[in-house]
A protein has these predicted regions:
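Charged, solvent-exposed interaction patches on well-folded alpha/beta domains
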Residues: 1-229
């Protein structure tokens, strides 16, 4: 009986100290400086100055004076995913009160037209509003799905062609592609076996026998039709 009383007394003492410590910790936490670490600076880098400032201002509206400990990547995703120039990003918390957003800009691959308006095609699979650009990019004709263009570009990258040598790409409803190189040679490709056809076309374009030809037609299996018109 005495042992049972001792056990009850010990249990009571343990519970008392636990309650006391919990109360103490909660009071300490509520007065802690950690809860006063409010964000007062968000630095964005990776795009041009105009875009960096614009994104930074959007973040400041959303996150200014919020506690840095309670900010997660999800707070940034909605804003950053709206910007088609962004390929990827990293967010760094710099304690006590700053955040850095490092952006990797998408690569501009080509130019195309949608509803009589020009757009860049980005490596992130998105269309980007067209503006002046100091690099020559190929023009893509036809109603393309961006993912189909990117897949075709990957095939070109595996071939002997350099993508920078291509000035125009034509996409047809059947799913077939034509390309024109910087020398003005139009290459009509088959619907299948594109890599093989591209490598054959490249060999023809550098062959002296075909130096005056302007059209290379590879649409028919095992046939090469070339003309100078």
């Amino acid at each position: 009986m005495l042992q049972q009383i001792d056990k009850k007394q010990k249990l009571f003492i343990y519970l008392f100290f636990l309650l006391l410590l919990t109360t103490f910790n909660n009071l300490s936490l509520s007065n802690s400086e950690y809860l006063k670490l409010k964000i007062n600076q968000i630095k964005v880098s990776g795009l041009n100055s105009k875009n960096n400032i614009q994104i930074s201002e959007e973040f400041n509206k959303l996150l200014h004076q919020k506690n840095i400990f309670f900010i997660s990547k999800d707070h940034f995703i909605n804003i950053l995913e709206k910007n088609n120039l962004i390929h990827s990003f990293k967010v760094r918390k710099i304690y006590p009160n700053s955040i850095e957003v490092q952006i990797k800009k998408t690569e501009l691959l080509a130019v195309t037209n949608r509803n009589n308006k020009k757009f860049f095609i980005g490596s992130n699979g998105k269309l980007i509003n067209f503006e002046s650009y100091n690099k020559s990019l190929p023009y893509v004709f036809g109603k393309i799905k961006i993912k189909d263009f990117i897949e075709f570009k990957k095939i070109i990258a595996k071939s002997k062609f350099n993508f920078e040598e291509i000035s125009e790409l034509y996409f047809f409803p059947s799913g077939r592609w034509d390309i024109k190189n910087n020398k003005g040679i139009l290459i009509k490709l088959p619907e299948t076996n594109l890599l093989k056809a591209l490598n054959l076309a490249y060999q023809i374009t550098i062959n002296e026998i075909f130096k005056n030809d302007k059209v290379i037609d590879l649409r028919i299996y095992n046939y090469v039709i070339s003309t100078n018109e």
